């Protein structure tokens, strides 16, 4: 029996991927896209980036809920301006690419994202850096659905509660722009909404499990696991093509 073209084994794998990705995002503050995009793309490129990003709204809403007083709306404004420009360029570039090349493109962008995450860059938190990194993040997100590494570098060392809340709203803004532009470009429709719904059970389970995982595991070990999963998934995409 198939559901939207996916069999029981694939649906189980999708759920497990979203559980792991959600737990890492809730614990570390970043990493949802780095984990889910390459692994979901291995199952089916039709799950990324649109359906995966649409489902991710649930995770980001959970991050913001109860922590909205930590959000710096001025920083969100600077970020939104950069995201708008970068996302538009990324989506336009994506529409010009042969779909058969997308798995390798996603794999390459994921490896770039991992490289940025471990690069040791030190960027101060100011309007210029937020805007510039948001343009780059928007471009990467428009192409692959992975926005995070550079803006995460800008927020390194900040209060964890502020990071979770502010970046949670930042991702909501980024994802809303991405989905809107994919709709305008004809790359997101009703079938994608159905695919996004397939990801929600794993998100719900992951949100419930996150506090227990955070108590049992060190954040740095989770971060290392996140990067290892992302690299493995990217290599499979590059080899599989």
Which residues make up each language-model segment?
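Short, strongly hydrophobic alpha-helical membrane anchors
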Residues: 1-10
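Juxtamembrane boundary at the C-terminal end of a transmembrane helix
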Residues: 2, 235-241
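Small-residue-rich hydrophobic segments that form or flank transmembrane alpha-helices
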Residues: 10-77, 134-135, 141, 148-207
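Helix-loop interface residues and adjacent transmembrane-helix termini in multi-pass membrane transporters
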Residues: 42, 70, 96-99, 157, ...
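Membrane helix-loop-helix hairpins that form the core translocation module of multi-pass transporters
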Residues: 46-118
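Residues within membrane-spanning alpha-helices of integral membrane proteins
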Residues: 53, 107-110, 114, 168, ...
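Interfacial loop-to-transmembrane junctions
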Residues: 78, 208-230
